[in-house]
Structures are given as structure tokens and as C-alpha cells.
Amino acid sequence: TGKVDPVSTPDRVLFVGEEYRPAFHGHVYFLDMKDHLLSPFASAYEGTAIHSLYPSNTDIFRLAERQGAFRGYVHPYGGENDPNGGENPSLGGAKAFPVDAALGTVEALEMSYGNHAAYIVWHHMLNNDIKIIPTGGEDSISNLYRTAIVGQLRTYVHLGDRPLSWDNWMTGLRKGHTIVTNSPLPVLT
């Protein structure tokens, strides 16, 4: 809708975003879109009617950017090893992330699991002077027992002296004023 949900309160703000789910390039998200959802919602599922690799994540990111959306990769990499290096690089679940990061079409990388792979890739970006904002979130499917519970990974955004609002939260997020955690709730002073 491009608007804060009516169930929001002064202490909690709800704004619904979108996940684009291509099987090959890697799943991505958009926050703060102002106009409409993007379609198709998925691509590259071999042996189905949506088998095509088009549109790429780069194409979809550019469409989302036209609406002012904040753009990132979700649940990108698992495991402890560098998915882009070593003896058997797999590129992980976010095969197009390094390209999108270099092109500047993506702003964030989600830290989704309690492992090091996404952090390693994030550090590669920083070491190459590519600013990527860390965010936290889990691929939680509430009726599937093997997925993370809702809220297991969180993104905290520093607002400074500004009150909580969607616009203030997004401003802090876009500036990279984030803390990502899967630990107990932090107390920030």
C-alpha cells in the first residue's frame, strides 16, 4: 500500500514489504515501496511455467528503486566457509549478490543464520569499498518446524533523538545505523 499499517502504535510500526523469489539468482526484499508490488513474484524454477531466468535481480532492483524502495538480499549464505572462494565455491543462495553490489543496485545483505558465511561475504564488500548495510531477519515459515522462529534475528536501527516512526526508521536504516543480532535483546545506552 505504500503506507504504515493501521495496527501500528507509537511503540510498534508495521509496514509490509515484498520478497522476490528467483530460484537461481537469490531471494531479495524491498522495503518502503510507494506504489505497487512488483511482478513476477518468482522466476527460474526449473521445470515449471516460471522457468525463465528473466527478470534478473538487477532488473527487479532497478524497478524497485524507481519507487524509492530499500533493496537487499535475504537468507543469502549458509555455513561457515566463504561461498565465493576456496576449493569449491558455490556462490551460495545469493549468486547474483556480488554483481548487484558492484553495480550499486542492492543496499543490504541480510544476516539470516547463526553462521559466518554472510559475514565473510559482507567483509569482502567492505574490503572493496562497497557499502552494504547489514540487516537481520530469518526465513521464518511459521508452520514449518525446521525454520527459525519469528524474531530470532533482528535489525535494530539507531534513531538518535527522533521518535519512532516508519520514516525515521527508514532514514536510519538507509544511513546504515543498524545492529544485527540473534542474541537476547540488547540494552543500548
Give a label for each model feature.
Residues 72-73, 110:
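Conserved beta-strand positions in the central sheet of alpha/beta enzyme cores
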Residues 31-66:
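Binuclear metal-dependent hydrolase catalytic cores centered on His/Asp/Glu-rich metal-binding motifs
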Residues 1, 70-72:
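Divalent metal-dependent hydrolysis catalytic cores, especially in the metallo-beta-lactamase
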Residues 2-13:
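Short acidic, glycine/proline-enriched helix-loop-strand junctions
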Residues 4, 16-44, 79-189:
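Charged catalytic cores and adjacent phosphate/nucleic-acid-binding surfaces used
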Residues 8, 65, 126-127:
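Anion (oxyanion) recognition and catalysis
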Residues 13, 70, 131:
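Residue-level detector of anion-binding/catalytic polar loops
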Residues 62-63, 74-78:
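Divalent metal-binding pocket/active-site signature
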